[in-house]
Each structure stands twice: as structure tokens, then as C-alpha cells.
Amino acid sequence: MATKLWDKGFEPDKMIEEYTVGNDRELDMRLARYDVQGSLAHIAMLETIGLLTAGELEKLTAGLKEIAAEIEAGRFEIEPGTEDVHSQVELMLTRRLGDAGKKIHSGRSRNDQVLVDLKLFLRDELRQTAEAVKTVFDRLQTLSEQYKDCLLYTSDAA
């Protein structure tokens, strides 16, 4: 089994570990597509400041797009023993591209990754919520126009 990022050299009680980790894997799966989006933006920045070559950027971009396609197709999973979605994406890239895959985390902390993922996720959720509210609003507008002459809607008013 892989060493956990937060491993301090002792084995925690399994019940405590299960309680503190909870359903992180399921939540991470919901963030996977946003992790890839954040990584695509990050590697573009790494290339502009000279930490990636143009060739590495091209390979990493293609690799991340492959992972994004796997996520959308429902074929992406966080392997047992892999800490989280960030580690899984890096592991997949490293397997496919070698050391270039390890470079996607240069210059950013885990907290940076989590915050970017959450920001992108919440932005998407808010957009979807706004669209749903607009749909309800439009329907209410249509109904109000349809029944504007009715003082009180009844089933026989139509």
C-alpha cells in the first residue's frame, strides 16, 4: 500500500482513520474534472515561466485531456492506496509520461489544488442553479400571463 501523504510513521486506529477520512473518495470523484481543469491552467503557467518545455506542456496537456475523457466516460477511479484525486491524476500522468507527470504539482500546494477544485466546482454548481432558477422563473412568467385574468387559480379556470 502506498504511504499516505500525512503519514507520521505510526498506524492510526482504523476506526479513527475511517471516521476522519469519511467519504473523501466520493467527494474527490466529484472534483476530478475540476482538478484536471485546474491542472491544465497550471501547466500552461509553468510553461510560460520556463518550468516546463513546450514538449512537456504538449504531452501533459494531451495526458490531462485523456484523463478528462476517462472522467466524463465514468472510467476514472481513485485506486486503493492512492491518497486523493490529486495524487491519482499525478500517478496516471507519471505512469503514462514518466517524470514529466510529476511536474504538474510544481509551484502549488495541496491547499492550492483543493481551493481551485472547489472554486471551479462551486462556480459550475452556481451556474446550474441559476439556470434552474431561470427555468422556474420563466415558467412562472408564462403561467402568470396565461392566468392574468383569474383572481384565483382553480382547476376549472382553464
Model-derived segments and spans:
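Active-site-proximal glycine-rich helix-loop-beta segment
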Residues: 158
